[in-house]
Every structure is written in C-alpha cells, then in structure tokens.
A protein has these predicted regions:
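Soluble FAD-dependent oxygen oxidases
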Residues: 1-323
C-alpha cells in the first residue's frame, strides 16, 4: 500500500445492484457519491457485481528486514521491552518516509514461546520495494542505533533478505497461511507523526495497551500508510477516513477471548477494549481515527473514528441508495 496505495484507492469502476433491483455503474464520472462510499465508506450501499481494479507492473528488487526483541531476564512487567517498543514507535514515521512498510507484533506476556525461549517479545517483518539492501540498511541505521541502548537488557536479533520480483517476496514473506478460528476483541487507532513527539505520552499508551502482566493481550503495528497513500489525498472520489492521509501507521490492540466465555466475561473484555485500551489510543492520537476493518464496534465516537469528516456524506449516500 505504501508504494501503490490502499485497496480502496485501486478501484476504478464498479457495477452495483441496488436495493430496488437496479444495476448501476459507478466510477470517477458517474454515480460518484456511490463510488466514493464504496471506496472507504464501509459496507451496506449495494451488492457489488463486478469491479475494475488497477494493475501494477512487477518489481525487480524487494529488501526485507526481520527484527526480534525479547527480555534477557523475564520480569512481571517486562518494562525494558515496552521501553524499546515505545522508542521504535516514535521512529516509524521516519522509517516509513524512507520507504519501509510491513507488520510488527508485541506481547507483554504470551501463553506460549514467542521469541526464542521467551514468552514476551516484539517481532516484525518490514520491507522496502525498489530499494537495494545497502540502501535499506542505511535507512534502518538510525533505528538500530536507538535500540542499541537496550543491548544489555534485551535479546536483539535481526536479519535481511532480498528478492528479485514481487511474487517470490510475497510467497516468502506475506502470503502465509495463519491458523484460523481464534477470537479476539479489537480496537485500533491511526497514528500520525504529531502524536509521537513526546516519549512519555507514547510510553504511557504502550503501558496501557500492552495489558496487565496477567493478561493475554496482543498488539499489532500496521506500517502500511505514507507514500502513495498520502499522495492519493488529492483523489476527490476517495471515501476513506481522511486521517489515513496523514497517519503513517495503525496500532491494533486485541484481547483474546474464549469461544466459551460467559456474557459477563465478554462484557468485561468489551469494556476494557473500549474504555481502557481504546481510550489510551485516543489520548495518544486524538486527531486521527480508526482502521474500520479492525475497529471497535462499541466505540462511542464511531462516527468520527470510522468516517471522519465523510460521515455526513456517506450517510446521505446510504439514505439515497438503500434507505
């Protein structure tokens, strides 16, 4: 997405069946309100029968970077790990501007081994498209230097890989088959550069969203914005929350919940997700929004969080095509 734009920005045209049975075409020139709604406004406007999507040429170089962090000595709070994660989060906008994107994960505590022999840790797979390994290493160097102060407290392991086309990269790094069937309650927040200026504010948010020491709580970094995503802000038929156009990444905070959990247990988890974890993310980045696909359906500010300034326009479109 950093190089080619978000999925919604790839749609050139759609054929849609409306609630009254009519089939219409929408694109940059006709039925533009419906086109805008389909490109970022969530579901529910009609049934998409077909769509025309942009195609992009193959690439001849992708450089991938893998990083693992884990406490050398496990403690109840694993504070050193969270300190390092906070430093890393502050540096991600610069790293993204230098061409990096990808996904990161961290756990304060995990019920199984996560990194090495540790049940607490951070791991990421980042990459640069169209950048040589030497160029990527140069861009990564400031981050590695910042993490070096944790070398006496954390296990730090990193590696690099290069690929000569997109599909070999995808099959090795991204097209993986993760196990399905787990359940989790999620909240998310788009993170812009302004929200990361103060280390203490970042660290306070990380402390809360990482969960208590006795909780199984996961956090995911989606370093998928910047680059073309920012450039596509000029597209006047985009329906995405405009916060995407100024946020370099998203943070997703998730609480695992058993399929057999009682209603009371689920209610407690929902409350914690919305009013503890979600509130901490909003406090960190009050001027952005959420990633709708992995957002909190109980968010009391869902209009602003999910849609931003486009809420009224999308509501008008919904009432027009599917009242």
């Amino acid at each position: 997405t950093r190089n080619s734009g978000l999925g919604a920005d790839q749609i050139l045209e759609a054929e849609v069946m409306l609630a009254d049975g009519r089939v219409v075409t929408c694109n940059h020139c006709e039925n533009t309100d419906l086109f805008r709604a389909l490109r970022g406004g969530g579901p529910g406007y009609g049934i998409t029968l077909s769509s025309t999507i942009k195609a992009h040429p193959n690439i001849d170089v992708v450089t991938a970077h893998h990083l693992q962090l884990a406490p050398l000595e496990k403690t109840e709070n694993n504070s050193d790990l969270l300190d390092a994660v906070s430093v890393l989060l502050q540096l991600l906008p610069d790293l993204n501007d230098a061409g990096f994107s990808g996904y990161g994960f961290w756990f304060r505590n995990f019920p199984a081994v996560f990194v090495g022999n540790a049940t607490s840790g951070y791991s990421h797979g980042f990459w640069t498209i169209g950048t040589s390994k030497d160029e990527a290493k140069k861009a990564w160097a400031p981050v590695r230097k910042a993490l070096s102060k944790f070398e006496d407290k954390l296990f730090i392991n990193e590696s690099w890989a290069s690929y000569t086309d997109y599909w070999s990269f995808y099959n090795a790094e991204s097209g993986l088959h993760d196990p399905a069937g787990d359940t989790a309650i999620l909240t998310s927040r788009l993170i812009n550069r302004e929200s990361l200026k103060d280390y203490t504010r970042v660290r306070d948010a990380v402390e809360v969203i990482s969960g208590k020491p006795n909780e199984f709580h996961s956090n995911v970094i989606l370093l998928v914005s910047g680059g073309q995503v920012f450039k596509d802000a000029k597209d006047n038929t985009s329906g995405l929350n405009p916060a995407w156009r100024k946020s370099h990444y998203a943070l997703i905070s998730g609480t695992g919940i058993s399929k057999t959990a009682s209603l009371a247990e689920r209610n407690r988890a929902n409350y914690d997700t919305t009013f503890v974890k979600g509130a901490a993310l909003k406090k960190l980045a009050p001027e952005t929004g959420t990633y709708m696909n992995e957002g909190d359906r109980h968010d009391p500010d869902f209009k602003a969080s999910f849609y931003g300034e486009f809420y009224d326009a999308h509501l008008k479109t919904k009432r027009k095509y599917d009242p």
